[in-house]
Every structure is written in structure tokens, then in C-alpha cells.
């Protein structure tokens, strides 16, 4: 047996001590006390922030919303079927954020901005917080450019400007989504990026909208964020904020964007479900006390940026569903008070065959004519007045049997004006076509036609102007005014 050399052993031990690296990791950990209905109650996580992302043992991610003295209430962003009582939870130290890039255009994503259209990954190097603060007063300027929807009733009487928030409100099945999708289709040549957020809708309805966009070439400038009816409430609640974050990315790059939330009633219901399960005290209609803030912080992110920030814009068109035309319910009144005007779609008009079924009498745009070109202002003023007088007369005429000639003429004119506001779905009109149509109606050129012939005549007129009088459209597009020359060209055509 060889002798043990102490100096050798001591040098080996010294080397081992020098190489020893004890890495200390401090983790904010917790244990699941209870899980179910998309909610987990967690013991521990002493230093977690409100809204922080937490990760469960099975990889499911949640958001810490309720911070109690002895436990934390978190909502799950997934089904969480593998989470059990006693499972470990780790605080990530991050607030919910999503990747953003131009590569999102033409894609369908979920509330976490992950693609769900089967077209592979989306490359992005930049991240933005889902809950970003809205631009301040100094960062904004007043709305002054029109956002053309392609619908005569809206562009002439309820004009929408870039950076505005215009609510679309009405009962189910009255064409609210059709107004929104037509607006997206009309942005094809307007250099506006569109974001369509589907919240709690049937998957078949969302697929139909996406197909329409694909067929009409609108997906090239559109992003669809979809969380369908079978998605967890947490993701339905997050989807609008994800859409707003994607739209803001383009706004700060000096581009114009338009975002449609379809619809915010479903988001409020998802938030109510989460809040009740988290045992937050219910308020009116069982909604939590902060449901107003839920929508106000979302819609305040729509803005027209100042010239120092590049004059980008986000125009928000939120949709809210009413029950039997009751606009005095909680969510509709909240949305009306937050937005800069509302477009009412009426079930009575829809059933009477007037499409789009927009009730022009009670719809309003608080930005108003600031968002119209001069040519439209000139012809549209008369239209609104004549339609208002017609609505009044029509109600009166139901009781009167013998009407004088002037009243009969006014009623006949009103019926023809109402006819010219009718439009097929997915058939938006250019500004010059709208101006020609309105001028024709308000100046009595349609009075000689039967009501059934009005739309046929207008179709012929638009076709004739494009083919034989292209200068008419060029004048309006280039100058934005209804000049004497344009008027003469139109009257020649008539």
C-alpha cells in the first residue's frame, strides 16, 4: 500500500474549493390551494404584482388579479386541466406583453398574439405591453381627417374622423358587424391598417368574416384577433387589449389604423364572470364596480397623435349589443358616455328592408363636419334636414286622409331619399359616387321615378359618370370641393 501524500490531497481539495460555485436563486414561489372555473387560489407569492404573469407547474400561464393577505387569486389563460391542489406556482416578474411587427398583417391570431390560421410562426423582435397607457392631452390633436366607411348614411350624416371613437349599437341581427366589415373593405385604397377583434363569437361567424376579407383582398392590410365563444373568459377579456396594442404599434409608426371590437358586451360578460368567481362584490346587473374603467381605458387608447409624434391615428369602432332596443342598460350607457358618438342600428328598419338599418334620427357623431371634405358638407346638409322633416311628416300623415300637394311632394321626395340610402352589403361607394347620389336626390332629379326604379337609375348614373365623365371624380378627389365645374359635369350627366 503506497503512502498517502498529504500535500497532493490538500492541493486537490484547494482546487475543488476554488472551482466551487454556489449559485443562489431566489424565486417567488407559491402553492395552489384551490383551482376550478378558470380561477386558482394560491398560497405564497408574497411579492407578486397586480397583473403579473404567474406560471404553473404544467406550463399554464395565469394573471394575478386579487392580492389578499393570505392568498392570491389568479385567472388562467388556458383550461388548466393538469393543475392540481398543491401544484407549485412561480411568479415570472413580467406583466402581460405581446410581440408586435408588420408581419402580423394578413394573419389571424388569438389574444396572446399567437397565430391560429395554420400559416406558421410570425417573426417579431419588438414587444409591447398589453395594458399600455393612453396618449396624454399634449400628445394628441383634434380630429380633422375623414375615415370613409363607403356607406352613404354614415359618411354624409354621421361622419367618422381618423382618431375618433364611434360606437355601433343595436339589437342582435341588425347588421352591426356588416357596417364594421364594410368599413374595413372600404379602406383598400385609403392606406389605413385595420384590426378586427372578434370577442366571444361563433367560430363560423369569424370564419365567414375572414373569408370575405380574403375574397375582397382586404386581408393584405388587416389583422384579425379572435377569441371564440368556447375560449376561456380570461382570453375573451384580454382580446380587445391585444388588438389595441397591435393598432398602437402602427399608430406610433406614423400610420393610420382602424380597430373594430365585435363586441364589447361579450367582453364585459367575460369580465363579470371572472370577477364573480374571484368573489369581487357585484354591482348593477351583477357587473363589478370597475366595469366602466374596463372599457374607458381601452377606448381612450384611440387617438389622433400630434404632429410632433407623426400624426398617426387609431380610430375605434366598438360594437355593443342591446336587448330589445334598450339603450339605457348598464353597458350601453357606459359605452355611449365614453365614445364620441353612436350609430344606432334598428331592428324595425332592418325588418322593413332598409339596409344598412341605421336610424339617422338618433345617431350622432360628436366630431361632426370636422371629419368631412368640403364637397360632402355642401351636399349633405340638405339631406339631413329633408329626412328629418320627412320622418315628422310621415308620422303625421298616417292620421291625415287628405294632404295638400306640397305635403304629398315632400313625402314623395322623402321616400326617394330613404331609397338612395339603401346599400347592398360589401358594396361600399367612393366619395364622388356618394356626392353624385345625394345631389341627385336632394335636387329633385329622382322625383319623376317610381320608388322601385330609384336604385336602378342611380346604378346607371354611377356607371355613366365613371365611363363618360371621369373628370367629375378627379375634381372631387383632387380638390375635395364640389366646384361649379363638377356641378356642371354632373348636371350634364343627369
UniProtKB/Swiss-Prot annotation:
Class of this enzyme: translocase
Catalytic activity: ATP + H2O + 4 H(+)(in) = ADP + phosphate + 5 H(+)(out)
One term under GO cellular component: proton-transporting ATP synthase complex
Keywords, alphabetical: ATP synthesis, ATP-binding, CF(1), Chloroplast, Hydrogen ion transport, Ion transport, Membrane, Nucleotide-binding, Plastid, Thylakoid, Translocase, Transport
InterPro entries named in the record: ATP_synth_asu-like_sf, ATP_synth_asu_C, ATP_synth_asu_C_sf, ATP_synth_F1_a_nt-bd_dom, ATP_synth_F1_asu, ATPase_a/bsu_AS, ATPase_F1/V1/A1_a/bsu_N, ATPase_F1/V1/A1_a/bsu_N_sf
Membrane topology designation: Peripheral membrane protein
GO MF annotations, alphabetized: ADP binding; ATP binding; proton-transporting ATP synthase activity, rotational mechanism
Chief location bin: plastid
Residues the record lists as binding ATP: 170-177
UniProt-listed Gene3D superfamilies: 2.40.30.20, ATP synthase alpha/beta chain, C-terminal domain, P-loop containing nucleotide triphosphate hydrolases
Keyword Thylakoid included in the entry's annotation: yes
Site (Required for activity): 363
EC annotation from Swiss-Prot or TrEMBL: 7.1.2.2
Subcellular location: Plastid, Chloroplast thylakoid membrane
Entry function: Produces ATP from ADP in the presence of a proton gradient across the membrane. The alpha chain is a regulatory subunit.
Quaternary structure (record): F-type ATPases have 2 components, CF(1) - the catalytic core - and CF(0) - the membrane proton channel. CF(1) has five subunits: alpha(3), beta(3), gamma(1), delta(1), epsilon(1). CF(0) has four main subunits: a, b, b' and c.
Family designation: Belongs to the ATPase alpha/beta chains family.
Protein name, as recorded: ATP synthase subunit alpha, chloroplastic
Species per Swiss-Prot/TrEMBL record: Pinus thunbergii (Japanese black pine)
UniProt lineage: Eukaryota, Viridiplantae, Streptophyta, Embryophyta, Tracheophyta
Gene responsible for this protein: atpA
